[in-house]
Amino acid sequence: MSASAVFILDVKGKPLISRNYKGDVAMSEIDHFMPLLMQREEEGALTPLLSHGRVHFLWIKYSNLYLVATTLKNANASLVYSFLYKIVEVFSEYFKELEEESIRDNFVIVYELLDELMDFGFPQTTDSKILQEYITQQGNKLETGKSRVPPTVTNAVSWRSEGIKYKKNEVFIDVIESVNLLVNANGSVLLSEIVGSIKLKVFLSGMPELRLGLNDRVLFELTGRSKNKSVELEDVKFHQCVRLSRFDNDRTISFIPPDGDFELMSYRLSTQVKPLIWIESVIEKFSHSRVEIMVKAKGQFKKQSVANGVEISVPVPSDADSPRFKTSVGSAKYVPEKNTVIWSIKSFPGGKEYLMRAHFGLPSVEKEEVEGRPPIGVKFEIPYFTVSGIQVRYMKIIEKSGYQALPWVRYITQSGDYQLRTS
């Protein structure tokens, strides 16, 4: 059968949950599914199999959900569809009614079920009675027969070796959020997205258990049950070391960590976030022989925060020459091989506004108008700040020898794909 990944989408085609089984198809390919489906529907040629390039989407609709399997190969379609309907059957037995709300309210147990239902693209355990023997309604594993031996005794913690020793026991926690933004030439935000991750550097002796607590606001949002006006974290993924059943029960992120660097958790936030650095640009032409570009940058984040290493890349015509610059802060340089002016600002406080003017000789303005202009790109990094408001409340480190360890937390918001189109 060989399915590469399985997605569950809401009625608008937005991914609620997904499981990548083989890694040979980019998870972003699912973005093409809904536009394809709507196009075929309008043409009156809708089929249960849709294709985009080499990627095939095999899908069914149930209630207000789309279940989609992706594959590169000429898979056995009847088996794939049989498996998708089996997912519906199993989930319906677990959650009584299979709909968007039941997926959002039970995302941890859904992940566990998807892990058991399929392995490397092939159906594994699809009998709901067998699944219910060790995946309970609360997401706990039932203990059958003899009591279980702790994983550390059997060395079942494959991601961590025994006998690790450090003179100084420390844990460094980085909460990093990247801002993806696309603004059109009229100033309207076309895309606004936050991609976040919690990364750890672990220097701990022995076989410690760590418990990480996040602020309550975020925990409620992770469950999908928040009634208050709040942002919602999506596509939440945990490292394999996290005890999902424990998290599902009391929202505690409990784990025995790998040694060194690893990503504990990742998430996405799709919401209209106010652009942190706003750019306005004006182009003035003079006698078809020179052009003046004026760029205004404004920090639209808290005044007590500072953006570091700001780089604003402004496209210029390919035949521009004789550059001259004037900046209210920072420095500007012309990079002819990229047809770009890079305006660098070492430190950009929130609420501040700065100006840069660039003058170029321009022998052929008309040519540039036909070609159009690439967008302005912005790079930045803001420490001690997250857009989502996620915060680490505590980190408990438990190890049988009873040593004291120091946890350090750092928050960083940085630019991802941050572009503003120009007219």
From Swiss-Prot:
Quote the cellular component terms of the Gene Ontology held in the record.
clathrin adaptor complex; clathrin-coated vesicle; clathrin-coated vesicle membrane; Golgi apparatus
For whether the record's keyword set contains Transport, the answer is yes
Task: Please report the PTM annotation for this entry.
Answer: Phosphorylation of membrane-bound AP1M1/AP1M2 increases its affinity for sorting signals.
Which keywords are on file for this protein?
Cytoplasmic vesicle, Golgi apparatus, Membrane, Phosphoprotein, Protein transport, Transport
Q: Which residues form a coiled coil?
A: none
MHD domain segment(s): 168-421
Q: How does it assemble?
A: Adaptor protein complex 1 (AP-1) is a heterotetramer composed of two large adaptins (gamma-type subunit AP1G1 and beta-type subunit AP1B1), a medium adaptin (mu-type subunit AP1M1 or AP1M2) and a small adaptin (sigma-type subunit AP1S1 or AP1S2 or AP1S3). Interacts with P2X4.
Protein family: Belongs to the adaptor complexes medium subunit family.
Entry function: Subunit of clathrin-associated adaptor protein complex 1 that plays a role in protein sorting in the trans-Golgi network (TGN) and endosomes. The AP complexes mediate the recruitment of clathrin to membranes and the recognition of sorting signals within the cytosolic tails of transmembrane cargo molecules.
* Protein name per the record: AP-1 complex subunit mu-2
What is the protein's species of origin? Bos taurus (Bovine)
Identify the coding gene: AP1M2
